[in-house]
Amino acid sequence: MSPQTETKASVGFKAGVKEYKLTYYTPEYQTKDTDILAAFRVTPQPGVPPEEAGAAVAAESSTGTWTTVWTDGLTSLDRYKGRCYRIERVVGEKDQYIAYVAYPLDLFEEGSVTNMFTSIVGNVFGFKALRALRLEDLRIPTAYVKTFQGPPHGIQVERDKLNKYGRPLLGCTIKPKLGLSAKNYGRAVYECLRGGLDFTKDDENVNSQPFMRWRDRFLFCAEALFKAQTETGEIKGHYLNATAGTCEEMMKRAVFARELGVPIVMHDYLTGGFTANTTLAHYCRDNGLLLHIHRAMHAVIDRQKNHGIHFRVLAKALRMSGGDHIHSGTVVGKLEGERDITLGFVDLLRDDFIEQDRSRGIYFTQDWVSLPGVLPVASGGIHVWHMPALTEIFGDDSVLQFGGGTLGHPWGNAPGAVANRVALEACVKARNEGRDLAREGNEIIREASKWSPELAAACEVWKEIVFNFAAVDVLDK
């Protein structure tokens, strides 16, 4: 008889409550290549043993409930249950543990990030036996990876579409983010693209408000980028935010963008949801559109060290759901992002194979097989003085995005774009000549500013702007 249909009436049913660890803590378990593996940071309530806490996480995120039920006898729990197979104490933290849980692949619908998260994090985070819980990392088996389309195009295809090689791409978020009319918004887009940027961007909360309806914005931005393309001879793009209140409205906006002939659209993947994001990613691949992803709302989920979901997990989920770019923090700007942690999930976004490396917060080796890579986007409080560090940290396969660092230039948007393009080209040239960007960065920018008055003006404006705050989420010592 099949284990799925085998009944265990002969064993008998004993009602009542038993400890989770009797069923779900299995330190002898040998993980399988097809298991989804999870690393949880667990903070139990006082008096709850770590083994019971880890087993409770495995149970409540798979087949378990708070009491024994007679229908357990109608299936094979051994086949379907999650298992806490290892627990380790977090050094330097009181009553914190890393609980490793293995989930059999049969628990998850193919090609559905929505279902994966609903199972693994959907209910267990409110469990009373835990003071706090954080999902630190996931190992996605190749058998499951292959059920996802992933990014619509990936890094190499994007470079071929844009005909841009050998340097990071350069972008700008249009400011003020809210309040401009569609025509004035399009004018700002044109000036930035004409000045030398590759992309401009809708801010995450620009959808279709009374001061600027989406269709008007799309039309004026398309006019701006085509005019800038004609003048510069370079392919340009503007991230047209298709995020909407319904999937149907989102798709209507994406279809209109394709009809306009623009190269890229945008989605807020956490507020919009994984189902909507995957739907849009499939449309973008089928219709030749690049897809820029904003991570609005991520810090609500990932910023606290002891509770929530680490961004490296959200980044992996985005690569599965689909996106060609995603915001990843800057390390040097105004937003949260410790260097080693950021570089860890940047590699998880871009590379095909990533080895376990706890020094960068990577708990599991991850093989993405044929899933395309995602370009990390550095954005938030950055300006020309940051250019050497950004070029050194993120390398060529990245998007460096300056909003206020372009539009805040004292001479206007186009000179602001010129300043950033000159700074970028100077840093890339210096790097290619073997110069040390980390040590000589300021000197490289000063040298370039001697023959670029736009860059010299930008250097003067932002020479004293720093964001000296320690990161909240740091690696365990």
UniProtKB/Swiss-Prot annotation:
Propeptide boundaries: 1-2
GO BP annotations, alphabetical order: photorespiration; reductive pentose-phosphate cycle
Top-tier EC class: lyase
Localization of this protein: Plastid, Chloroplast
Modification N6,N6,N6-trimethyllysine occurs at: 14
CC per GO annotation: chloroplast
Keywords attached to this entry: Acetylation, Calvin cycle, Carbon dioxide fixation, Chloroplast, Disulfide bond, Lyase, Magnesium, Metal-binding, Methylation, Monooxygenase, Oxidoreductase, Photorespiration, Photosynthesis, Plastid
Chief location: plastid
Active site: residue positions: 175, 294
InterPro entries on file: RuBisCO, RuBisCo_large_chain_AS, RuBisCO_lsu_C, RuBisCO_lsu_C_sf, RuBisCO_lsu_fd_N, RuBisCO_lsu_N_sf, RuBisCO_lsuI
Modified residues (N-acetylproline): 3
PANTHER family: RIBULOSE BISPHOSPHATE CARBOXYLASE, RIBULOSE BISPHOSPHATE CARBOXYLASE LARGE CHAIN
Family: Belongs to the RuBisCO large chain family. Type I subfamily.
Physiological role: RuBisCO catalyzes two reactions: the carboxylation of D-ribulose 1,5-bisphosphate, the primary event in carbon dioxide fixation, as well as the oxidative fragmentation of the pentose substrate in the photorespiration process. Both reactions occur simultaneously and in competition at the same active site.
Note in the entry: The basic functional RuBisCO is composed of a large chain homodimer in a 'head-to-tail' conformation. In form I RuBisCO this homodimer is arranged in a barrel-like tetramer with the small subunits forming a tetrameric 'cap' on each end of the 'barrel'.
Record note on quaternary structure: Heterohexadecamer of 8 large chains and 8 small chains; disulfide-linked. The disulfide link is formed within the large subunit homodimers.
Designated name of the protein: Ribulose bisphosphate carboxylase large chain
Taxon lineage: Eukaryota, Viridiplantae, Streptophyta, Embryophyta, Tracheophyta
The gene coding this protein: rbcL
